[in-house]
Curated annotation (Swiss-Prot):
Organism classification: Bacteria, Bacillati, Actinomycetota, Actinomycetes, Mycobacteriales
Keyword entries, A-Z: Methyltransferase, S-adenosyl-L-methionine, Transferase
GO molecular function annotation: methyltransferase activity
The keyword Methyltransferase is assigned to this record: yes
Originating organism: Mycobacterium tuberculosis (strain ATCC 25177 / H37Ra)
Name used for this protein in its record: Putative S-adenosyl-L-methionine-dependent methyltransferase MRA_0901
Length: 325
């Protein structure tokens, strides 16, 4: 089970999910009609080696990513999620955002595969061990970003706002943020601090997009946790329920709407249908995953955090309205 001060690298605990979703993106990229193309996902998987390279080479025919109901829909989910956030960034940059913040960046490759306007700076925040692996692979393969990229080594449960600003983020300029595949790995309290941090640093006109999940009934979660542990004893390596917090601080649409953002929610099932991917039947293993997840995007329209935006260490969450010049 998780603790508030636990740690990991790219192959352990929460960090290993970066390789899992990279493998899923690589499998999606191999399709004849991919929802998103990520050529660097395979690079990271092969650099890590082991099961992740073997899955892509077809050497693990019984691997959960390539067999049964779960594998098909999980790969579809990752393809759809990647496309959703890619489209979000396209809208945000078209609106003039030239500061991009990727929270828990992991093995995200958008700095390298998307087209960015001249003058864009991309801030990638994650634990030092994760960024060390990523940066080493990028250097080994001579992969260069398509915008200025700054790695910010910080635990998002700590004072990440200060680290971000110390690396050149300007809270007086609009910005685009994502929290993709992150919130379920944070306690409700850590989610609250994350939302407040975004709200404090985002000037008017800023964009944000997050992926959130509806918590399970506590008894249902406990039952799934017990079944997962039993499956582990039989050789199933999946430990999802042992890594997540079955908590949610607030619904993202409501929280951001109340603070001067205009938010829009898109359930994963709805988005899958929109992009032509199957939604799992209600009685299948993948159904609860798809049902629980919602994508939320928002644009800041008028309220900003108080006090001054140059003081990210402040815990005040009062608000004041920006007046037009």
């Amino acid at each position: 089970m998780r603790t508030e001060d636990d740690s990991w690298d790219v192959t352990t605990s929460v960090g290993s999910t970066g390789l899992l979703v990279a493998a899923a993106r690589a499998l999606e990229t191999q399709k004849a009609d991919p929802l998103a193309i990520d050529p660097y996902a395979e690079v990271f998987c092969r650099a890590a080696g082991g099961e992740w390279a073997d899955v892509l080479d077809g050497k693990l025919p019984d691997h959960y990513l390539t067999t049964g109901d779960f594998g098909e829909h999980f790969v579809n989910f990752q393809g759809a999620r990647t496309r959703y956030f890619d489209e979000y960034f396209s809208r945000a940059t078209a609106a003039g955002m030239k500061q991009v913040v990727i929270l828990a960046a992991g093995l995200d490759s958008r700095a390298f595969r998307l087209q960015w306007p001249i003058g864009t700076t991309i801030f990638e925040l994650d634990r030092p061990q994760v960024l060390d692996f990523k940066n080493a692979v990028l250097a080994d393969y001579h992969i260069r970003p398509r915008a200025q990229r700054r790695s910010v080594a910080v635990d998002l449960r700590d004072e990440w706002q200060i680290a971000l600003c110390n690396n050149g983020f300007d809270a007086n300029r609009p910005s685009a943020w994502i929290a993709e595949g992150l919130l379920v790995y944070l306690s409700a309290e850590a989610q609250q601090r994350l939302f407040i941090g975004i709200d404090t640093l985002a000037s008017p006109g800023s964009h944000v997009a997050v992926e959130e999940a509806t918590p399970l009934d506590p008894c249902e979660f406990a039952a799934k946790l017990e079944r997962e542990r039993a499956a582990n004893a039989q050789g199933d390596p999946r430990r999802f329920f042992q890594m997540v917090y079955n908590e949610r601080w607030a619904r993202a649409t409501e929280w951001f709407d109340e603070r001067g953002w205009r938010a829009t929610a898109t359930p994963l099932a709805e988005y899958l249908r929109r992009v032509g991917r199957a939604v799992p039947e209600a009685d299948t293993e993948a159904a609860p995953m798809v049902t629980a997840i919602t994508f939320v995007s928002a644009v800041r329209t008028g309220l900003v955090a108080d006090p001054a935006r140059t003081s990210p260490s402040s815990t005040s969450i009062g608000f004041k309205r920006f007046e037009a010049d």
